[in-house]
A protein has these predicted regions:
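Phosphate/ribose-recognition catalytic cores of enzymes acting on nucleotide-derived substrates
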Residues: 182-301
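N-terminal catalytic cores of NTP/NDP-binding nucleotidyl/phosphoryl-transfer enzymes
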Residues: 6-61, 65
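Residue-level signal for inorganic ion chemistry
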Residues: 26, 67, 105, 164, ...
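Classical nucleotidyltransferase
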Residues: 86-192, 214, 300
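A glycine-rich helix N-cap at a beta->alpha junction
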Residues: 63-78
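Short acidic-hydrophobic, aromatic-tinged amphipathic segments that line or gate anion-handling sites
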Residues: 1-8, 76
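Short beta-strands and strand-loop turn motifs
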Residues: 16-20, 46-49, 75-79, 104-109, ...
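Short histidine/acidic/glycine/proline-rich micro-motifs that form metal-
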Residues: 23-24, 50-54, 81-83, 110-114, ...
Length: 301
């Protein structure tokens, strides 16, 4: 799959296009992508409205990772502000028809298009003028409720990982580059990988989690701390740092996909010094190891 950020780069001349925020790449979005990729005579193109300021479940890089293997051949990331500022007709003419060469456009049945908030029927009428047809996808529901980004955000904030998996259709992920931190983990005898994540990414509440880190086609069990480290007073900013079990390699600069599976405990300050910290860490590691061993057993079954 090709991922570009320039709408006017050379694109296929006959495309099937889906557009929107696709925040969460959840079951509803997956239904749209399935329809998008069903037209074998057209090139499937996904236009993602990229947010750089508003909070998001998934960044553009994370969306790219999740699109691999779906059948989508082109992902185009365009600034959300620019896309949303256009009225529906301008968007249909300049973006869908001229830039993306759309022959078929796939939208959810309740989609709104443009700054003037036109519906799918209005887009279909515009398509008659600009050379494309519109296909709608029914709303996807789970347990009687529409699957939505808002429902997923509530699950993230509540640390409801089973609910997240149900709505996302997979485990919640965080993606980023391993960056140099303060090396605070080393003084506790457990060097950690510090993940540089986008500042506008919606993360689970501060705490300790059981995770899998994906690098170069392999995955590694880990214990991840999201948030402040109250026992290290010189580190006042939130971090995402992972202690990888049975792993001792230099991975600075590597891209990591972090799957977050389970909440272990909240962040707390230890007054008893390094011995107390180490005792708690050992307890956490054993809990993470037990849980993640079962996760891996199921993955490899």
């Amino acid at each position: 799959m090709k991922h570009i950020t320039n709408l006017f780069e050379t694109l296929p001349m006959s495309a099937c296009v889906a557009f929107g925020h696709f925040d969460g790449m959840h079951l509803g979005h997956q239904a749209v992508m399935e329809k998008l990729c069903s037209h074998l005579d057209l090139t499937p193109v996904l236009l993602s409205f990229a947010q750089t300021e508003k909070p998001v479940i998934y960044t553009e890089r994370e969306k790219e990772y999740l699109l691999e293997g779906t059948g989508v051949e082109w992902m185009v990331s365009a600034p959300a502000k620019e896309m949303e500022a256009m009225d529906a007709e301008t968007f249909a003419r300049e973006v869908l028809a001229k830039a993306l060469h759309a022959k078929i456009v796939v939208v959810g049945e309740n989609a709104t298009i443009g700054a003037d908030a036109k519906d799918a029927a209005a887009l279909a009428a515009l398509g008659e003028a600009y050379g494309f047809t519109v296909e709608t996808v029914p709303t996807v529901c789970f347990a009687g409720e529409p699957v939505s980004s808002q429902a997923i955000i509530k699950a993230i904030e509540a640390m409801d990982f089973p609910r997240m998996r149900e709505l996302l259709g997979r485990t919640y992920i965080m993606q980023g580059e391993v960056v140099h931190g303060k090396a605070a983990g080393r003084k506790h005898g457990m060097p950690t990988a510090n993940l540089g994540v986008a500042p506008n990414k919606i993360s689970p509440p501060h705490g300790v989690y059981g995770t899998l880190s994906h690098m170069d086609g392999k995955y590694y069990r880990g214990m991840t701390n999201i948030g402040l480290r109250p026992s290290d007073d010189d580190i006042p900013i939130p971090t995402v740092e992972t202690f990888l079990l049975n792993f001792d390699q230099d991975i600075y600069g590597r891209q990591v996909i972090l799957e977050v599976f389970v909440y272990i405990r909240g962040v707390k300050k230890f007054a008893g010094g390094l011995a107390e910290v180490r005792k708690q860490i050992d307890k956490d590691i054993e809990q993470v190891r037990t849980y993640m061993d079962e996760v891996i057993r199921k993955l490899e079954a």
